[in-house]
């Protein structure tokens, strides 16, 4: 008797999960980076966007696939060493969670509300009230994991897409101006600078974390075979990636048209707000606020949920991921409340302070995430040469942390890494990874030869 093929998702479920994934990834940073990139890149925008799309979409989609193949982000990173996996994944969750990304969602949404506030209103009081209300809603939705996909995939996700299409469509139909000449640093090496700018979305790190929620959702929809789950995650990731690519290009077009109107702009949010107000007046300002609110709320819900579940399964509940939902419910709710409350407090220090800490943290984590994902995609070869994991993961982590600490606290100090190729564009980790890979191969062969 022929065995039946593993059950997969229906097409409409794949689309729903893909849109939910898009909603989890597409936050404030995704909205504000492309317009600023295009305004500064000007006529070099096509080249800059190629690099940006590779980093902001290609790497996260590869991240989803690599995690699906490995099982979890921790299992992927633990190929370097179990302790390394534990520490690295915890750092990723803290970075994309309560220490940076979660408080940034509330702060960014509030910044877009400020132009709509009545004159004389205390910004400090308004920020506090908004943050409390924002995180109360996010916390309430987080406690209903089954609702997350339905809300993000069927309501707020499509609404967000529709509003962005409205703003971008206006820019396409009624251009505001021609592209300006490229500004530094896009006037030299636009594609490379676009790639580095793609770091700021943090979506590669998010892809390592959100796999937990997406995998659970796919299980709930009836897919139980592990290989099939990985395949469905890949399909959903492609859908999310295509949606993001289309919207990124549209947002870039809107920003590129304002290069001569506001050449000194330093904030993508201001660029979008200006574009919308020039097309729609006050209604445009309201639309932009709603766009930012939906994007930030979507991401906040996903981040609180995945961070709470990870730390709950890893450090709190006995049995970890194998524990029953009943055993998980109370600890999960407590952690979700703690993360939401902490993020609420941190968000009140203001967006500028939060963003000040983002660059060194991302520069320390991103190179490690990139090499882990790339090795995860060819895990069969790397698993056959296990020392490759140790050398590449360990050496790149050391190099990235040292460089990030130098950049944050000792700017201008010279390091030996500065003499390496690509160091001038912040990618000294790449040649370091190549050398470590070769050493890891040689080490693996030496160990295998010694045993034989």
What residues fall within each predicted segment?
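Membrane-water interface regions at transmembrane-helix termini and the short interhelical loops
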Residues: 68-75, 134-156, 220-223, 341-356, ...
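Membrane-interface loop-to-helix entry segments
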Residues: 141-171, 358-370, 389-398
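Select transmembrane alpha-helical segments in multipass membrane proteins
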Residues: 10-21, 46, 83-96, 128-132, ...
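Hydrophobic, small-residue-rich membrane helices and short re-entrant helix-turn-helix hairpins
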Residues: 144-155, 191-194, 214-243, 260-273, ...
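Helix-loop-helix connectors at the membrane interface of multi-pass transporters/channels
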Residues: 37, 107-126, 219-220, 300-337
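TM-loop-TM module centered on a large, flexible mid-protein loop between adjacent transmembrane helices
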Residues: 73-78, 247-297, 359-362
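C-terminal membrane-solvent junction of multi-pass transporters and transport-like membrane proteins
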Residues: 370-438, 449-452
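Hydrophobic, membrane-embedded alpha-helices of multi-pass small-molecule transporters
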Residues: 16-26, 31, 170-177, 185-254, ...
């Amino acid at each position: 008797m022929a065995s039946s093929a593993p059950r997969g998702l229906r097409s409409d479920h794949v689309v729903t999960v893909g849109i939910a994934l898009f909603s989890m990834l597409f936050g404030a940073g995704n909205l504000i980076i492309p317009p600023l990139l295009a305004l500064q890149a000007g006529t070099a925008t096509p080249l800059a966007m190629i690099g940006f799309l590779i980093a902001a979409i290609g790497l996260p989609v590869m991240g989803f696939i690599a995690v699906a193949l490995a099982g979890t982000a921790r299992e992927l990173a633990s190929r370097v060493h179990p302790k390394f996996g534990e520490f690295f994944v915890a750092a990723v969750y803290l970075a994309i969670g309560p220490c940076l990304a979660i408080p940034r969602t509330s702060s960014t949404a509030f910044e877009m509300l400020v132009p709509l506030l009545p004159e004389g209103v205390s910004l400090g009081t308004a920020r506090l009230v908004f943050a409390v209300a924002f995180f109360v809603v996010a916390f309430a939705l987080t406690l209903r994991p089954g609702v997350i996909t339905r809300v993000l995939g069927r309501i707020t996700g499509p609404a967000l897409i529709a509003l962005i299409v409205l703003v971008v469509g206006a820019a396409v139909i009624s251009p505001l101006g021609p592209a300006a000449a490229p500004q530094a640093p896009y006037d030299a090496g636009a594609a490379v600078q676009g790639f580095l700018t793609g770091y700021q979305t943090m979506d590669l790190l998010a892809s390592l974390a959100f796999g937990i929620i997406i995998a659970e959702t796919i299980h709930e929809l009836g897919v139980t075979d592990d290989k099939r789950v990985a395949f469905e995650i890949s399909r959903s990731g492609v859908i999310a990636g295509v949606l993001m690519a289309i919207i990124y290009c549209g947002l870039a077009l809107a920003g590129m048209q304002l290069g001569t109107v506001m050449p000194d702009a330093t904030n993508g949010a201001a660029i979008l707000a200006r574009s919308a107000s020039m097309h729609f007046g006050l209604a445009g300002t309201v639309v932009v606020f709603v766009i930012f609110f939906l994007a930030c709320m979507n991401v906040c819900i996903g981040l609180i949920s995945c961070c709470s579940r990870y730390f709950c399964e890893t450090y709190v509940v006995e049995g970890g991921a194998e524990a029953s939902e009943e055993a998980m419910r109370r600890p999960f709710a407590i952690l979700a409340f703690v993360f939401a409350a902490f993020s609420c407090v941190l968000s009140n220090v203001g967006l500028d302070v939060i963003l000040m800490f983002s660059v060194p943290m991302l520069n320390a984590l991103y190179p490690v995430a990139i090499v882990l994902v790339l090795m995860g995609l060819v895990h069969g070869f790397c698993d056959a040469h296990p020392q490759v994991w140790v050398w590449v993961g360990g050496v790149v982590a050391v190099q990235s942390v040292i460089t990030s600490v130098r950049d944050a606290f000792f700017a201008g100090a010279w390091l030996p890494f500065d003499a390496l190729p690509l160091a001038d564009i912040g990618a000294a980790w790449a040649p370091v990874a190549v050398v470590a890979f070769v050493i890891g191969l040689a080490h693996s062969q030496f160990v295998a030869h010694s045993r034989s």
